[in-house]
Amino acid sequence: MRAGCGALAALALALTGFSLPSLGQAGPVVQVDFSNPGLSPSHWTLIIHPDGSAHFHSERGNAPSATPQNSDSIRLVVPDQDRDLRLSAQFARHVFEAARNDKWFNVKCESHRKVAFQGWKRLSYSGPEGQGSCEFNYSNDEEIEALGDSMVSVANTILEGARLEMLLQHDRLGLDQEIEYIVEAQGEGRVQQICAIRGILARLADDPGVMERVRKRARLLLEKKEE
């Protein structure tokens, strides 16, 4: 599931916690929790509201530390993240439509098929209609599987944005390889909702202190419309 970023609305709402009951008091939310101890971050949470305001929290886990000076920029380990962000209203609408179509996630979504482990994805809904959640590595439900893939791609976007911020501060030459990777990943669908990192892309596009090729690619990402 891919949706365009559209025009940015007001700044994302500040969130005070991650438990569904407390968030439910402020309106319906969809939350996805991802965990895979073999990856960095090993765990992340993405909370989405119907208007596209969202919050992302990640924990690096036991991955070895890395810095821009001694690491391949594409594999640069990102420190724990805790940030508000803005997704498109169209994307948020698709997310909540999927939740409604799948009984607010009150379904069995794990296929139990012998497939490669990609990471546990727990989809949860809390709102006026009630609460529900389901967890899976791979789901036979095409809509749930696609939603899980989209959430992972959005998380990838947020983490790539964090890498750009680190490289801008510590290793500007590394920006060239990193932003080339993002352009390629977007074309393949491995990153979605570029509007989530609009801030750092705009900084790169306007910064005369970075390579012109980096600035050009940042502008390309800002201008390209996702479908």
Where are these regions (language model features)?
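Short, well-ordered, aromatic-rich surface patches in folded extracellular/luminal domains
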Residues: 20-38, 105-227
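Bacterial N-terminal signal peptides
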Residues: 6-17
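Positively charged n-region of N-terminal signal peptides that target proteins for export
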Residues: 1-4
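A short, surface-exposed interaction/processing loop segment used at functional sites
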Residues: 54-69, 152-165
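N-terminal secretory signal peptides
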Residues: 26, 35-67
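A short, structured loop/turn motif at beta-sheet edges
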Residues: 48-51, 85-94, 125-131
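Charged, amphipathic alpha-helical segments
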Residues: 88-112
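Acidic/histidine-rich, surface-exposed loop or edge segments in extracytoplasmic proteins
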Residues: 56-83, 182, 199-200
